[in-house]
UniProtKB/Swiss-Prot annotation:
Localisation per UniProt entry: Cytoplasm; Nucleus
Residues recorded with modification N6-acetyllysine: 187, 199
Entry GO CC: cytoplasm; cytosol; endoplasmic reticulum; endoribonuclease complex; male germ cell nucleus; nucleoplasm; nucleus
Name of the protein described by the UniProt record: Translin
InterPro entries xref list: Translin, Translin_C, Translin_fam, Translin_N, Translin_sf
Family: Belongs to the translin family.
Gene it is expressed from: TSN
E.C. number(s) listed in UniProt: 3.1.-.-
Phosphoserine found at: 190
């Protein structure tokens, strides 16, 4: 094979990979659009009247996750299953965002942390890498940390809306998250930096709870702060 033939062959490989990446980008753009729609819907809970609409907003968000499933099913077909991490950077951030959105819905519904397995059911993907397109553990953890930041904001807006018990519940939840993350030996630099922000979320929520307790807005909050 001549030198020119070698490079022609290599160009064929490069062009084929570029085609794959372009197909992936198209699907990811659709995922990003749906994620924005879900986020816009859920952001309404931060508004005064939004607290009364939480069940309706969560139900609507779950309907949008049906569209997410469709897009992810399409994405799986765009590349060989064994090359997941070769193209992972294309969908990593939107997948983390979708984990956060799923976790936010579950928290608003039950005030509990969604499991990684439950997220994969909501998204229609696999929990284990051996089964193909899956939810990477670090992507799950990143989404959970985004949730913590969102909940710290919600604690402040809850007070504005006159919901004085919600910040206490959020404080308990975020402190449990913090305790959980302390058990992990995080090697990923990006994940470690995001985890560093969790302590500020914890502090922000605790300040809200403390402010409520000293102002005597509700006995539940005051009693909890005294116990601390």
């Amino acid at each position: 094979m001549s030198v020119s033939e070698i490079f022609v062959e290599l160009q064929g490989f490069l062009a084929a990979e570029q085609d794959i990446r372009e197909e992936i980008r198209k699907v990811v753009q659709s995922l990003e659009q749906t994620a924005r729609e879900i986020l816009t819907l859920l952001q309404g809970v931060h508004q005064g009247a939004g607290f009364q609409d939480i069940p309706k907003r969560c139900l609507k968000a779950r309907e949008h996750f049906g569209t997410v499933k469709t897009h992810l099913t399409s994405l799986k077909t765009k590349f060989p299953a064994e090359q997941y991490y070769r193209f992972h950077e294309h969908w990593r951030f939107v997948l983390q965002r979708l984990v956060f959105l799923a976790a936010f819905v579950v928290y608003l519904e039950t005030e509990t942390l969604v499991t990684r397995e439950a997220v994969t059911e909501i998204l229609g993907i696999e929990p284990d890498r051996e089964k193909g397109f899956h939810l990477d553990v670090e992507d799950y953890l990143s989404g959970v940390l985004i949730l913590a930041s969102e909940l710290s904001r919600l604690s402040v807006n809850s007070v504005t809306a006159g919901d004085y018990s919600r910040p206490l519940h959020i404080s308990t939840f975020i402190n449990e998250l913090d305790s959980g993350f302390r058990l992990l030996n995080l090697k990923n630099d990006s994940l470690r930096k995001r985890y560093d922000g969790l302590k500020y979320d914890v502090k922000k929520v605790e300040e809200v709870v403390y402010d409520l307790s000293i102002r005597g807005f509700n006995k539940e909050t005051a009693a909890a702060c005294v116990e601390k």
